[in-house]
Amino acid sequence: MNIIDQLEQEQLRLDMPDFRAGDAIKVHVKIREGEKERIQIFAGVVIKKTKGLACARFTVRKISGGIGVERIFPLNSPSIDKIEVVTRGRVRRSKIYYLRNLRGKAARIKERRMA
């Protein structure tokens, strides 16, 4: 194992839940304002998850005031306090970019049954 792989293994976070595209999640992000630090919740649907060790990231989309907002989070970021999986969605694609063009009821995702 070379030095780069060893450094990436040290930076990995093992406390993240298992989720994938289509899942509705809440991301608790640490926001620093001046000398204060607070937690802000970004809730939405995962539309993309890229794999990798230290460079893994995921994109969450939500509708805020009738406008779609997407935010990209590094999975191993220290600014993420925790991730909650609200519902598990059933989709047939790993990247669900088609949600960007859908509105209203058409943008709903069926819930995956956990057996």
Swiss-Prot record:
Keywords: Ribonucleoprotein, Ribosomal protein. GO terms for cellular component: cytosolic large ribosomal subunit. This is Large ribosomal subunit protein bL19. One of its GO terms (biological process) is translation. Pfam families: Ribosomal_L19. InterPro entries: Ribosomal_bL19 (IPR001857), Ribosomal_bL19_CS (IPR018257), Ribosomal_bL19_sf (IPR038657), Translation_prot_SH3-like_sf (IPR008991). This protein is located at the 30S-50S ribosomal subunit interface and may play a role in the structure and function of the aminoacyl-tRNA binding site. GO terms for molecular function: structural constituent of ribosome. Belongs to the bacterial ribosomal protein bL19 family. HAMAP family: Ribosomal_bL19. It comes from the Bacteria. It comes from Desulforapulum autotrophicum (strain ATCC 43914 / DSM 3382 / VKM B-1955 / HRM2).
